[in-house]
């Protein structure tokens, strides 16, 4: 374990003393540090009346137990504190460490020892080996009662809301939409979980089209074959219009007011929401239009879908109506809500957070968007090509519609609405235009970057630099496009398409607690969070701070001095093998074993580079045909320790999200020896070589220059590392699998790579 603490708010000695006293610790400024430490320890043994015995099980050095020490006349030393602190945090002497000073240095322990009250205060805010902060562990053990009132420590809400007395209710919010032309406004089902309390409380909202169920068989049947011919496109310039964000004016309902009349027992929850539920935040889960329990069509990513979620935030602020049932005869008021909302969730869920933020909806104070899509074109297309998300060849937006239109999982809904649904789905399948792979109005209507200037909320993004599902370009684009007037924060980790709130190496939960206590509970805690926090790829459990995602300097590296050719065509056996399992293709491609058609360029680095942003390939090429795909990958190649991209369990169910509530595993990315690491990649239709909206003809056997931007990353490269560039045509994981006989020739003498860095790195 190594500490990377971003959540602790520096506290003065007097403030620390008062907070400790407020928690019930019997400290006294007139007493010695030794006496105060003993009082602190005895009060911490919440489950034991025999505190002498508890003290006797701790040691203050390699030979002395704590009970003996406190009965002696020995002075308290720094070494004594180090032994005690480590044990309180769950580290075991003679197992985890023998030399506390060296161990504390190794784990980057953040606590200082100048003042006993400051020191104990900071210790309470530190995470233990199990992943829980010491204060959270003590509260769970009974330091404070679950009295359904707010209690704070170091600017963060504590788990003092009783999760055994939760209210679970369902309401149906009226939207301004009629997505299936039914003649009535669409309703969206809202599942609410909230503590029983006299306070008006803020809300953690997860907008999840998956939460009411998914239709795997329908999606599987809709999934496309990737084998086919790459189209030769007619030269043209694509034109699109950005539509203003409009909404109907709402009028107050005159219906009788009623409490919610529908309840539920269970819903798949997000554990970060659970963490905040025990700390006085309501949890709501909304699947939006076109899902089971709601009405309407699954419009998949456009602003109609976004508005169906926005309506829920408006209801929390008293602006729109929610009904007790589909009868629409009684309304429910969110009289428990303070009107302030934070949205959470990964992938599609985080995507809806981004979309909501771009509406500028009142009451949305914070989005915590993890692995979020910023424009749907970049999820299912790339540079004029159909480009499947990593791991899902053949998926497209209409396939996702089939997956998430869960109304068809309710038989009564199916027989009444399926004909209309199928007609709308067919329209969607035509609009996505798999034939050309081009950007069009349909995709433009699902591009949240067009409305990014409307964002008013505070923004937190997390993203994996090894996420080839929702690729890093999504967060790179949206983060750098956000208005300068807002506060924004970005956590970039070395994993794939995963959550990071339950990792050992970073206090993400506690950082969000400080931020949301500030923004949603109005606590003036002076919490400040860095703009870009990045997981160092060279060292285990180490996070660094940067000013920006994207460097201000470009380094240029030549690619060679010869001309090399890439064939597109494979023999039938190889083609069928790669179509059957794209992982076989990737393995052969990365090994460079002459089984795949590729140009491999090895670039031994002559100095250190902190790659920060989008690498670009500047290539001089010619093709033998009027169509061509160019694909590229950049690898850090050669044996050394690197991160795996999926976190593994450190301790099973050690993370407590309240008082023994919604426990989950503590995880971390393994750091082990490996042969290579993909840094970046990309695919390009050479007919879209100038920009996305310009389609150009290809003159066979005529040289032309292209600039090819690859996926952004932050990656530390060292002198002597081998940067491997692979150029090829068809990518069997992502692109159309056209086995036509064409070739691309690259003049390496006229080609180079630019690496974005920060000046001075």
Swiss-Prot record:
Annotated GO CC locations: cytoplasm
Major location category of this protein: cytoplasm
Q: Which residues form the active site?
A: 347, 467, 497
What Enzyme Commission number(s) appear in the record? 3.4.14.11
Catalysed conversion reaction = Hydrolyzes Xaa-Pro-|- bonds to release unblocked, N-terminal dipeptides from substrates including Ala-Pro-|-p-nitroanilide and (sequentially) Tyr-Pro-|-Phe-Pro-|-Gly-Pro-|-Ile
Question: Pfam families given for it?
Answer: Peptidase_S15, PepX_C, PepX_N
Signal peptide range equals none
List the subcellular locations. Answer: Cytoplasm
Its GO biological process terms? proteolysis
What is the top EC class of this enzyme, as a single word?
hydrolase
Q: Which GO terms describe its molecular function?
A: aminopeptidase activity; dipeptidyl-peptidase activity; serine-type peptidase activity
Q: What keywords does the record list, in alphabetical order?
A: Aminopeptidase, Cytoplasm, Hydrolase, Protease, Serine protease
Family that this chain belongs to: Belongs to the peptidase S15 family.
Assembly behavior:
Homodimer.
Instruction: Give a short account of what the protein does.
Output: Removes N-terminal dipeptides sequentially from polypeptides having unsubstituted N-termini provided that the penultimate residue is proline.
| PANTHER family in UniProt | COCE_NOND FAMILY, PUTATIVE (AFU_ORTHOLOGUE AFUA_7G00600)-RELATED, PEPTIDASE S9 PROLYL OLIGOPEPTIDASE
Entry protein name: Xaa-Pro dipeptidyl-peptidase
Q: What is the lineage of its organism?
A: Bacteria, Bacillati, Bacillota, Bacilli, Lactobacillales
Instruction: State the encoding gene.
Output: pepX
